[in-house]
């Protein structure tokens, strides 16, 4: 009996001796994973993030029928009834993500640089200088729709970063794409000027002039060399969006949407109250 107890004690101590280091190693690994979090310096590429967004959008569209009806789904169904020919929002979102993914690959492959070198003087592009004005005016209309889509996408992507890192030729192309050679101005009236004077203005890009004073003065006879001396004036448009400027049909649609929104909100709040009443009664009975 004594020998058997001694053997059992030795066996238990031997197992404890073997299990002890294993427990320490496992505990050490858990502590390392808990308190040590290495910093990942590598950022996932934008194409991979876009693929993930596309996959999530597709999964969300397939599982949307399993989720309870929300307020946004109710409003989308209402608009689908009002506009039967309207496109599906989920399909538009997925196609938009695929388009962004394709444009990201084109931008990462350096296609924008190829376009700029092809149409806008490679020497000025490599030296980080401004594009010649005549070359910009002549070759910008030659850009295709795919080239303009890539340029718009590059502008939206690069404007999120540090603008000091942008090249001068890209900034010039950005400005010309957004405003043209007339600059950020509105409501230019060309009817009161002669064709020769109008053609002279169109041949002078990036100049400062007061077109409103010229169009009010029918006897104005200004040489192209004197155009740069005309005072620059910014014209502010006083037109604003007001309720009175909306047509009756749009007012009816907006009023209907507001009415349906209020009705859905009241219905949801009533359902929530009916769910809370049984819970309160059960708590009172339990007490």
From Swiss-Prot:
It is a single-pass membrane protein. Its main location: mitochondrion. The keyword Membrane applies. The keyword Transport does not apply. Residues 1-24 form a transit peptide. Keywords: Membrane, Mitochondrion, Transit peptide, Transmembrane, Transmembrane helix. Signal peptide: none annotated. Belongs to the GEP7 family. Involved in respiratory growth and required for cell survival in the absence of prohibitins or GEM1. This is Genetic interactor of prohibitin 7, mitochondrial.
């Amino acid at each position: 009996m004594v020998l058997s107890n001694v053997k059992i004690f030795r066996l238990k101590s031997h197992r404890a001796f073997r299990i002890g280091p294993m427990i320490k190693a496992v505990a050490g690994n858990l502590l390392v994973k808990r308190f040590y979090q290495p910093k990942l310096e590598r950022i996932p590429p934008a194409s991979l993030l876009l693929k993930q967004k596309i996959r999530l959008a597709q999964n969300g569209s397939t599982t949307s029928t399993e989720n309870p009806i929300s307020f946004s789904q109710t409003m989308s169904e209402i608009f689908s009834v009002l506009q039967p020919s309207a496109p599906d929002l989920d399909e538009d979102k997925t196609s938009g993500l695929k388009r962004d993914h394709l444009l990201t690959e084109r931008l990462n492959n350096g296609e924008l640089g190829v376009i700029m070198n092809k149409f806008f003087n490679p020497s000025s592009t490599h030296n980080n200088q401004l594009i010649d004005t005549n070359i910009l005016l002549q070759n910008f209309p030659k850009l295709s729709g795919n080239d303009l889509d890539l340029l718009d996408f590059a502008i939206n992507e690069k404007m999120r970063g540090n603008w000091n890192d942008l090249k001068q030729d890209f900034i010039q192309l950005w400005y010309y794409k957004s405003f043209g050679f007339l600059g950020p101005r509105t409501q230019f009236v060309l009817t009161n000027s002669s064709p020769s004077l109008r053609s002279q203005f169109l041949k002078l890009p990036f100049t400062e002039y007061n077109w409103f004073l010229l169009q009010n003065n029918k006897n104005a006879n200004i040489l192209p060399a004197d155009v740069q001396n005309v005072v620059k004036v910014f014209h502010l448009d006083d037109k604003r969006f007001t309720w009175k400027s909306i047509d009756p049909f749009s007012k009816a649609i907006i009023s209907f949407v507001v009415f349906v929104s209020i009705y859905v909100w009241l219905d949801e709040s009533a359902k929530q109250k009916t769910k809370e009443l049984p819970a309160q009664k059960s708590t009172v009975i339990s007490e």
